[in-house]
Amino acid sequence: MDYQNRAGVRFGGGGVAGYQETNAARRERLRKLALETIDLSKDPYLMKNHLGTFECRLCLTTHANENSYLTHTQGKKHQTNLARRQALENKKSQENAPQVLLGISQSHVQVKKSVVKIGRPGYKVSKIREAESGKFGLRFQIKYPDIEVNAKPRYRIMSAYEQRVEAPDRKFQYLVVAAEPYESIAFKIDRAPGKFWSYWDAPTYTIQFFYNLTKIS
């Protein structure tokens, strides 16, 4: 580019390029760089229409040739729209992620190991009395010689309205004991026991409690 005839420039010296020339040179460098690094055949936003011109589907602009389109892709409008599209896609992926994780966790929860039951365990029920208070209670000793390795029996108190074996009687509740691979067993007890205690000393599981009474029927 000849800058010799510019005002204020010495003859034979290099002139200072103006804004338009500098900007044009910059666009040309970007275009050449884009030609070397961008494969237009893989650009999802480039479309050649029936008139032979090129369209940017992201910005809805029309371009006479590939060079014009490449120049457009380096501009502010195209880069801004690309950033917005990427942000939108990231947001959608984050919204979908919890649903996928939730589906996986639910599938794990629903998986239940199938255990072949081997029948009811042997047990012994005894009436007991606390020496200090004189209160009476019950002791349950249940045998689990074939319990699963590292397993431990469990118990829970069931209300009369949860069971389906007898007509509900609010004066009673049920002590339910379970241990794989044995069948669960239940004992009908008075409604309000006091002190409660359990102990597992394989193969015997012991449960005992005392009523707030000084006699027991």
UniProtKB/Swiss-Prot annotation:
Organism listed in the record: Schizosaccharomyces pombe (strain 972 / ATCC 24843)
Main location: nucleus
Subcellular localization: Nucleus; Cytoplasm
Top-level taxon: Eukaryota
Family to which the UniProt record says this protein belongs: Belongs to the SF3A2 family.
Keyword annotations: Cytoplasm, Metal-binding, mRNA processing, mRNA splicing, Nucleus, Spliceosome, Zinc, Zinc-finger
Subunit structure: Belongs to the 40S cdc5-associated complex (or cwf complex), a spliceosome sub-complex reminiscent of a late-stage spliceosome composed of the U2, U5 and U6 snRNAs and at least brr2, cdc5, cwf2/prp3, cwf3/syf1, cwf4/syf3, cwf5/ecm2, spp42/cwf6, cwf7/spf27, cwf8, cwf9, cwf10, cwf11, cwf12, prp45/cwf13, cwf14, cwf15, cwf16, cwf17, cwf18, cwf19, cwf20, cwf21, cwf22, cwf23, cwf24, cwf25, cwf26, cyp7/cwf27, cwf28, cwf29/ist3, lea1, msl1, prp5/cwf1, prp10, prp12/sap130, prp17, prp22, sap61, sap62, sap114, sap145, slu7, smb1, smd1, smd3, smf1, smg1 and syf2.
SMART domains: CactinC_cactus, ZnF_U1
Keyword Nucleus: yes
A GO-annotated cellular component: catalytic step 2 spliceosome
Chain's gene name: sap62
Zn finger (Matrin-type) location: 54-84
Known role: Involved in mRNA splicing where it associates with cdc5 and the other cwf proteins as part of the spliceosome.
MF (Gene Ontology): RNA binding; zinc ion binding
Record's protein name: Pre-mRNA-splicing factor sap62
GO terms, biological process: mRNA cis splicing, via spliceosome; spliceosomal complex assembly; U2-type prespliceosome assembly
UniProt KW Metal-binding keyword: yes
